[in-house]
Amino acid sequence: MVQAPLSPSLLQTQSISQPPQETEALKAWLEELTQKIIEGDRINKSEALTLTQIEGQDSILLLCEAADRIRQACCGNVVDLCSIINIKSGNCSENCRFCSQSVYHPGENSPIYGLKSSEEILAQAKAAEAAGAKRFCLVSQGRGPKYQGAKSKEFEQILATVRQIAAETSIKPCCALGEVTPEQAQALREAGVTRYNHNLEASEGFYPEIVTSHSWRDRVETIKNLKAAGIQACSGGIMGMGETWEDRVDLALALRELGVESVPINLLNPREGTPLGDCHRLDPFEALKAIAIFRLILPQQILRYAGGREAIMGDLQSLGLKSGINAMLIGHYLTTLGQPPEKDLAMVESLGLQGGEAPIPGEYQTRS
């Protein structure tokens, strides 16, 4: 299938204006921009790039306050809680430079195992539900069911497991299996999958720097297949792989144009043995700035704290929830450990927020 191009503006380098430097002037400028967004206007690439020029902790915190106002106005105070399970790990055919599961550069402590049993997956779904998660995502290595054949036994087993989770729990099953055909997307929808994770990972321009075994356009095609089947798209990226601020803005704009509902923000926690294993870790305030800019570009989307938040943010994790974040992945990640769910829930409640299931774009205004 030949993919229609995204807006040409996403691929063009633009000159960058400077934001006001004096504190009160910056406050006034951000207030005007914030009100414009709350009233339903969308910022353009030029305005987003100007936001990237805000420097210094005090000024970044002003940007974070603006993002928090937008989050409150457009999404409310519910923090969406989800959990994941790595149902098949290691020996992945793809060469993603950040990932320790790739057969090209396996991480030293990355587990390798085949597809877990339905019983084991169901047990972990029930544990995630008991811990407070509202969604439970089945994540598998590999390029995807699209390349396993129309009668893949593995895909059929996953569909059966999804049906079992839907029947025996109240947690909502999600999947992240890689690329799918329109027919497979429909089968997932009929089994009970209402949201599917397939991260763009980076901007189209930067993508070849981190993956060459498949294209960015391949990922876009799968997102379109999912949405055509009536499945919500969960798609975001990773910060800290060497991308520029313009790359980050282009990623957010592409996600906006695709109409994704949920946007995971991963902060690279470099894995030893991978090509990005020696990457310099993001400064927490750079991460907060990126989160805030994503919120200004994506005012109604579910913006999710995902991998790397504990390692990168440390004691500043809670600031993310006051900088535009309104969702969290709780529990463990694919190949690294997370903090105890009860600690996450306590952090959410300490900020006057509540764990639950956040509204998708447009739903909060409807509820209100």
From Swiss-Prot:
Keywords: 2Fe-2S, 4Fe-4S, Biotin biosynthesis, Iron, Iron-sulfur, Metal-binding, S-adenosyl-L-methionine, Transferase
Annotated binding of [2Fe-2S] cluster, by residue: 137, 174, 234, 304
Cofactor binding mode and count: Binds 1 [4Fe-4S] cluster. The cluster is coordinated with 3 cysteines and an exchangeable S-adenosyl-L-methionine. Binds 1 [2Fe-2S] cluster. The cluster is coordinated with 3 cysteines and 1 arginine.
Coiled coil stretches, renumbered: none
Amino-acid positions noted as binding [4Fe-4S] cluster in the UniProt annotation, renumbered to this chain: 92, 96, 99
InterPro entries in UniProt: Aldolase_TIM (IPR013785), BATS_dom (IPR010722), Biotin_synth/BioAB (IPR002684), Biotin_synthase (IPR024177), Elp3/MiaA/NifB-like_rSAM (IPR006638), rSAM (IPR007197)
Pathway(s) of this molecule: Cofactor biosynthesis; biotin biosynthesis; biotin from 7,8-diaminononanoate: step 2/2
Top enzyme class: transferase
GO MF entries: 2 iron, 2 sulfur cluster binding; 4 iron, 4 sulfur cluster binding; biotin synthase activity; iron ion binding
SUPFAM superfamilies per record: Radical SAM enzymes
A GO biological process held by the record: biotin biosynthetic process
Pfam families per UniProt: BATS, Radical_SAM
Catalytic activity: (4R,5S)-dethiobiotin + (sulfur carrier)-SH + 2 reduced [2Fe-2S]-[ferredoxin] + 2 S-adenosyl-L-methionine = (sulfur carrier)-H + biotin + 2 5'-deoxyadenosine + 2 L-methionine + 2 oxidized [2Fe-2S]-[ferredoxin]
Cofactor(s) the protein requires to work: [4Fe-4S] cluster; [2Fe-2S] cluster
Catalytic activity, EC: 2.8.1.6
Keyword check for Transferase: yes
Domain Radical SAM core: 74-309
Self-association and partners: Homodimer.
Family affiliation: Belongs to the radical SAM superfamily. Biotin synthase family.
NCBIfam families for the chain: bioB
Chain's role: Catalyzes the conversion of dethiobiotin (DTB) to biotin by the insertion of a sulfur atom into dethiobiotin via a radical-based mechanism.
Name used for this protein in its record: Biotin synthase
Species assigned in the record: Rippkaea orientalis (strain PCC 8801 / RF-1)
Taxonomic classification: Bacteria, Bacillati, Cyanobacteriota, Cyanophyceae, Oscillatoriophycideae
The gene coding this protein: bioB
